[in-house]
Amino acid sequence: MPFADVNGVRLSYESVGEGVPLLFIHGGYGGAATTLAPQTHAIKTTLPRDKVRTILYDRRNAGLSAYTDAHYTLKTLAGDALGLLDHLGIGKAIIVGSSAGGPIALELALSHPERVIALCLPNTGANLASLERPQGKTRRDLVERSKSDGDKAVFAQRKASLRVPVPSDSKDPAEIARQEHLKAALQAVSDDDLLRYSIGEIRNYEAYLDADYTARLGELKMPVCIIHGTADRVVPYAWGEALHKAIAHSEMHPIPDADHGILSYDGAAVALRDWVERVIAKVA
């Protein structure tokens, strides 16, 4: 994958297909699992390559992109996305922000609407750091401890658990193989590299803490598509419904019985592809 130096950081990216540009902002919070055993994003094979130029990239402190211990906000992460578009000579693009990529996409669309043809928000919400969910409190506590005790002290407390991958109940052979690779890689990685990944993950958590776009959703004027699984255990389906209610002109595509990682479901892929093709037909 090529790299681009933008907004003070080196980003790894990939571009597939030709046509109307679409930028995919991935989810997750970076860290060791994304770098030692990168995932393949389903969107890469979802869209017609003769009509859409799909651009995928690793956010800072994730995947093969640069790790930094600097503090930043979602404005910074949206600036990274814009910087990549500038690097590629792209003025406007369809933006797809999945899961933790959703708030970044919202920041980009609200701050620079002239750069966004249309916006898709799969399995995400306006405030992912909400204390309504246990993960929100856990991540906030981790950030606060990192600030008060220091990154190295927090790493010393977490090191053993960081070397054990989060269990997966996936039945997909490719994901099972990835988990096995990750398990071995986490045992082999040096403490110095694991510390770097740990700090990067915490910095990503921090960027979301005060980011709540609920009150500004009505400002969005571009076409908006929301895709959410009704059985999502990570980002509740109700959060997707809340986006739809607040963005009056948005489309809502519920995917029955689907969990998180919605774009890997056939129904979601069909909904996304259909929406993108309708958007393209209007701008062509």
Regions found by a protein language model. Name each.
Residues L220, I226-H228, D232:
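Short beta-strand/loop motif that positions the catalytic acidic residue
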